[in-house]
Amino acid sequence: MKNNQFGRIRLDRTTELEELKNIHFIDADLLADPKAQLKDFLKRSCLVSNSEATFQQKLSNLLATPDQTMAAFFESDQPLTLEIFILLELQLLQFEADTDYQIEDPLSAISKIQLPELDLKNFETSADVAHAWYNLLTTHTKNGEVYLDRLTQQGYFVSFYPTTTKPLFFNGKAQAVFDPHQLIREVVYVEAPLDTDHDGQRDLLKAEILRPAQTAHGYQAPVLYTASPYNQGTNDSYGEAITHNVDVPLTEKAVQKISKSDVTAEPFSQTLPAERKVAGMATKASETFAREQPYTLNNYFLSRGFAVVYAAGIGTRDSDGLRDTGSVEETISTTAIIEWLAGNRRAFTNKTDNLEIKASWSNHKIAMTGRSYLGTLATAAATTGVEGLETIISEAAISSWYDYYRDGGLVAAPDTFQGEDMDVLAAEVLSRKHDAGDYLGIKAHFDQILKRIEKDQDRDSGNYSKYWDSKNYLNNVKNIKADIIMVHGLNDWNVKPRNVGKLWNAVRDLPINKKIILHQGQHIYINAFRSIDFTDMMNLWLSYKLFDVQNGANEVLPNVIIQDNVEPETWNTYQDWQAADDEIREFTLQAKTLVDRASETKNEAASFRDSLDPEFFEMYKNDLKHWHTDLLNTEHATNGKNQMRNNRLIFKTAQTKEDWLIDGTPEVSVNVAVNQPFGMLSFQLVDFGDAKRLNPSPSILQPRSLSGSFDWRTDDLREFTLQNAVTPWKMISKGHINLQNRTNNYCVDEVKPHQFYDVKLELQPTFYRLLAGHQLGLVIYATDFETTIRGNQELLYSLQLNQSHLKIKLAH
């Protein structure tokens, strides 16, 4: 395995000693003898030992040298050496002898596993031992947590619980000294400046709060806030019932010559009813809850002095209002919670008594967390500049809803959600439907909203419009004041990388701190990965942003961290992603090949069709993996004859002589004609070459092994591992375009049958290492069974190859 720690800070020895005292590894002074000091550290960390005999038994299970136990070592006159300490460290960190390290040569494992190096050669004093112990406590175990967190799970900080009144920090990070079993759980109803259900009253929004017991006695906690429309339940069958049929034909669109101003959303306005009249003040909530739908990263911080708030927003169970995916109202309902937490909005104990309750326990510093829709709402909130929001950690977040459900003038579904759209998602998260009595009063109005969304989303055209512009958070990035950490999968075909790519470019020059972490996963969380200290980094960051701990987090954490797609457990740092100084490589299409654009080319043409026999159309529709295999397979050996052989064109470079680090947005330009007055093209950039690649999904290494607190909620330890079998290809990026949207996503151009047009588009941004000896391929086709509508029409496409090109950028 490889250890990658970015959230670990280096401190001077004086500070290390003070911090060791703060967490009770040292009482007043160090012991005189280095060996005695090490034994004392071990005894304090042996949490299962209640007697000297038990402790000696544990020491007998540890080796000091290849032929001596730690118990025997402490009885001997042998001095403590670096080799002895490192061998002990490797055992305490759960590494396995003969697998991860050699007992005879423990020092070589430090560089092999990428553990922090210890700047000692000899242990001359107990201060040297303390320095080494501090180093050990802040080093990751084999199982995805620093050693101090491992001790924490075993109960190290339980004795701190009765006397804890404020956070405790070690190595710049908050520690688990708050008893998570004594959390205060309460519900409040925040009055939002909205009336989306038009009942003549401002919408009340349910918020579920978990906060340390100490907040009842004057301690003020920072808040991790997760806005999750799924939090109060979903209507899966309802959404499935109104999912759109995608087996429909592509049609000709009326020519439309308009400007950007014609598709710019009108400023939001509304008429609001008056605020509720306050009938009195309350200091305690009148409602509680048993168990929320948690995010495991939030769970980790509940024992570290943070409060956590979950709110589902308008139209969800126990809240007022109605859902409208991506709307301004949805953003306002998100920021209303922040405003209450920051002391700038009212909330009530319930929906009838009008008893106001304040967040007196909050320190008015809020961070937002969450993935997908949750991270999307964090992004939306940040673009308002709302007071109190200090930072967001947005994972797999949408930055423009058009880029989620559309691409290049086409309906383009998120991965595995063919037929979903803005209306379907709104229906799925209208959890007020779960309460029949509540739903009775809003059903008719919500039906009207769904009809309006269906009309405005305009699946018939796929064009960008005022509707989509009102759901484009990129329009408001200038308002962002909160610092941002973005996390996204380079293989996320649900919320595609364009969303984070555009946001990263948009905030690059803003006067805020911004970081980005790109992993090789799909639509996933990465906080429980073994090879990267994501949770530690977020602890360092949140301690800095919400507790104002001067730990240098902004300088310590790299601006760009990207997981390698070739070597497992490898994460590299960069100054930028989609960097301006990347090297440009351009290729021209020739018969089945991609050649350097500067080389001499021939006037060649190639064509492909888009129709399939009904039998094979149904086969591919019901077996997308089979379709994708046949699309990329040039051997024509999948289940006999490859039915896609005439439905796509594949162009490959020569085998590369060196590794290429493809960075940013590949660009394709083709000279194309079609036999109808309409058409579409799809493209995939592909790595062709035999290799054992990373599995698409992370493997569970140890189930329920991580919690970060004693006797607390657990998470599975995960990691990307190599596939057992060699595979011949890997898709790097993809893109789609309607031939009538050659100018942009909102202008509609004429397409005359059999007339050639220049069509340009950008594929999804990426960061990909193409190994030496592999070939870079461009696959051109029309219907994408995973993404586009599937009309199975008699369309024939022709390309002028020497007028068609691919441009990529290579990182230095």
UniProtKB/Swiss-Prot annotation:
SUPFAM superfamilies: alpha/beta-Hydrolases (SSF53474), Galactose-binding domain-like (SSF49785), X-Prolyl dipeptidyl aminopeptidase PepX, N-terminal domain (SSF81761). Keywords: Aminopeptidase, Cytoplasm, Hydrolase, Protease, Serine protease. It catalyses: Hydrolyzes Xaa-Pro-|- bonds to release unblocked, N-terminal dipeptides from substrates including Ala-Pro-|-p-nitroanilide and (sequentially) Tyr-Pro-|-Phe-Pro-|-Gly-Pro-|-Ile. The active site is at 372 (charge relay system), 492 (charge relay system), 523 (charge relay system). One of its GO terms (biological process) is proteolysis. Its EC number is 3.4.14.11. One of its GO terms (molecular function) is aminopeptidase activity. InterPro entries: AB_hydrolase_fold, Galactose-bd-like_sf, Pept_S15_Xpro, PepX_N_dom, PepX_N_dom_sf, Xaa-Pro-like_dom, Xaa-Pro_dipept_C. GO terms for cellular component: cytoplasm. It is found in: Cytoplasm. Signal peptide: none annotated. Transmembrane segments: none annotated. It comes from the Bacteria. Homodimer. Removes N-terminal dipeptides sequentially from polypeptides having unsubstituted N-termini provided that the penultimate residue is proline. NCBIfam families: PRK05371.1-2. Belongs to the peptidase S15 family. This is Xaa-Pro dipeptidyl-peptidase.
